[in-house]
């Protein structure tokens, strides 16, 4: 079953309300937050609950929490949810958003990352995915969305104008199906892993370079957001646990 994923960037970034700031080189678990736009800041990360699509559900809830952080670029966290109804509609995008100065793609050096995670629950339809956004200016509207799906659980699928991949490349040592489609005025590219990858290490710059060479992504664009999280459609007693996540932009 092919499902549509809506863009999350503007709603996620608009959620800067009542942020709780944590400091220190090493932090341990804090209480979960369950409000729609709940967030916590630690190091170079903002951890969002981001229940932007909860109105699409007949019932459900979701809570997110910080488990630990080390330095500025490494975090462990979890999110737990149950959602029913609203078939084919994303309910949220709990994610760890990396805070950095927007950088033009032509000047990007690397985006090294690693992510170890696991999912538990019943009847889960969801993804586990990076979400990158670019704009023609450092503070402009998002024009391109680049998703990197490490898992498509229960039949979840990306935005696609045709329902079929436009290519099946090998990038960063893994095989992917690449989908292309529009979300309003924004071009969306989604790399969907051929097999579920629960321990992932790569340079995300390789995905950007592939799109520049093969799909015409302009090098004049600015990278403005790097996020990693999960988009649930439906399921019960589900928990995504990120035991270790790191990223940086150089």
Swiss-Prot record:
Keyword annotations of the record: Carbohydrate metabolism, Cell wall biogenesis/degradation, Glycoprotein, Glycosidase, Hydrolase, Polysaccharide degradation, Secreted, Signal
Compartments where located: Secreted
Glycosylation sites: 72
EC top class, as a word: hydrolase
TM spans (from-to): none
Family: Belongs to the glycosyl hydrolase 12 (cellulase H) family.
Name of the protein in its database record: Probable xyloglucan-specific endo-beta-1,4-glucanase A
Organism expressing this protein natively: Aspergillus terreus (strain NIH 2624 / FGSC A1156)
